[in-house]
Amino acid sequence: MASQEHYSSLWEEANQAVQAAIRTAQQAHLALEKAKASQIAYEIQHAEMEYQKAMKQLQAAQQHLPYVSAEQQIHFSQAEQMLNQESPQIQ
């Protein structure tokens, strides 16, 4: 029984890490879009910081991918692609 509880705990940890990475990637994507539209230096700097944070979080969450559902893996891949398309070359 302890093994099942341990597995469940690991799965939950993996799931939360992947979900957090996806949310951060979505936030960074929105920040980059806003910065592109506004061309305000502060917005651009903020968006670049969000992008870097999201990329680091996605990289850290990759180790958890084998332990989450196929649906979560798809969402993760979409978030990763979204960020790769929105790299901070804003001008």
What are these regions (language model features)?
Residues 1-91:
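Long, charged/polar, soluble alpha-helical segments
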